[in-house]
A protein has these predicted regions:
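Membrane-proximal soluble regions of multi-pass membrane proteins
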Residues: 22-25, 29-40, 271-317
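"…together with the soluble PPM/PP2C metallo-phosphatase catalytic core" -> "…together
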Residues: 2-274
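Short, highly charged low-complexity linear segments
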Residues: 136-138, 234-238, 261-264, 283-292, ...
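Juxtamembrane boundary at the C-terminal end of a transmembrane helix
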Residues: 328-336
């Protein structure tokens, strides 16, 4: 019956996100036009360039996922009522993972609104953005500590699980770094949804392998929502997830493993995001030190564009990287 709950969560996530996408595309287009002070569509000269692809599509993911997780968890509890009073605090872990993911998504919404209002792609200033991301990470860690679910160590290849006192600080830094890395992936058609979809499938499998099968309703619901969102975000995109979708996906990849005590799994699962963000970090550091760029373009998807790769091939390439990260995560889980 719990398998039925996972299927129900995935199907409902797909259906709700697909329905919301049909509604959100025209609404977000009008919102962007209004906030930027543009003229109505019929008054725009037809010779002018087409309007930019609407962003903030991550709101579809957030709403669809929340409803689907609720339905999936109710189905799981109906099949196994002991989940409500489990000594492993299944419900507390699920709620904390949801809250943390939505907290990062809310930071992304604020970032997207700042992008629209300022007529630039820069969004929020770095200091307040990092402060909000750090607050979201601290919220997750604090709630886990209060509920007695905060992991006190980490899994290392060849050594297994070892206790590590500064682990909470490491996990907080990891969540913020992952959010920043995922943020720069926005703009590449379909890649955020495609890579996050692979990561969610991996988390479903890993939670089953590690004994957290009921909590797989969250990645199942988000996987269904991401698959539906690809109907609009697959190249050529008609709707982008925006910063809110990127940070929402990053929050899920970071918070779900953390809440089951295996935060280190988010490192390989987010491999494409680390490459995107790491390339930007190297570009900035090298330019400040040498006065010239290290790469012809950054992040990774821009570099691939510069080399003449099509948007569809970039999508497939980054999804392949995500599959490689999933394979590494499976290998890491075997040491647990």
């Amino acid at each position: 019956m719990i398998r039925f709950a996972l299927i129900a969560a995935s199907v409902q996530g797909f259906a709700l996100t697909a329905a919301l996408g049909n509604l959100m595309v025209p609404l977000l287009r009008e919102l962007q036009r209004t906030m930027r002070g543009a003229q109505p569509e019929q008054e725009i000269d037809r010779k002018e360039p087409e309007e930019p692809v609407p962003t903030i599509g991550g709101l579809c993911l957030m709403v669809g996922t929340l409803a689907a997780v609720g339905a999936g968890w109710l189905a799981a509890c109906a099949a196994q009522p002991s989940l409500l009073g489990s000594d492993r605090q299944m419900m507390s872990r699920l709620l904390i993972a949801l809250l943390g993911t939505f907290a990062f998504g809310a930071v992304g919404v604020a970032d997207d609104l700042a992008c629209i209002r300022s007529r630039s792609a820069l969004g929020m200033r770095r200091a307040p953005r990092l402060a909000l991301e750090a607050a979201a990470a601290a919220l997750v860690l604090g709630l886990l500590a209060l509920s007695g679910c905060l992991p006190a160590g980490l899994v290392l290849p060849g050594a297994g699980y070892i206790r590590f006192a500064p682990a909470p600080l490491l996990w907080g830094a990891l969540l913020v770094a992952l959010a920043e890395a995922a943020r720069v992936a926005d703009g590449a058609d379909g890649t955020v949804c495609g890579t996050a979809f692979v990561a969610m499938l991996g988390l479903m499998m890993l939670e089953t392998q590690l004994g957290w099968f009921p909590l797989a309703v969250f990645p199942a619901a988000l996987a269904g929502a991401l698959m539906a969102f690809l109907l609009w975000d697959f190249p050529p995109a008609k709707l982008h997830p925006g910063k809110c979708g990127c940070l929402f996906a990053a929050g899920a990849i970071g918070c779900i493993p953390l809440c089951i005590g295996y935060a280190e799994l988010s490192v390989p699962l987010a491999l494409p995001f680390w490459l995107e963000g790491g390339m930007v970090a190297l570009q900035i550091l090298f330019y400040r030190r040498r006065g010239r760029p290290l790469f012809a373009a950054a992040p990774l998807h821009r570099w691939l564009e510069k080399r003449g790769m099509s948007a569809v091939n970039i999508f497939y390439s980054l999804c392949a990287l995500s599959v490689c990260g999933l394979a590494l995560a499976v290998c890491l889980a075997r040491w647990a």
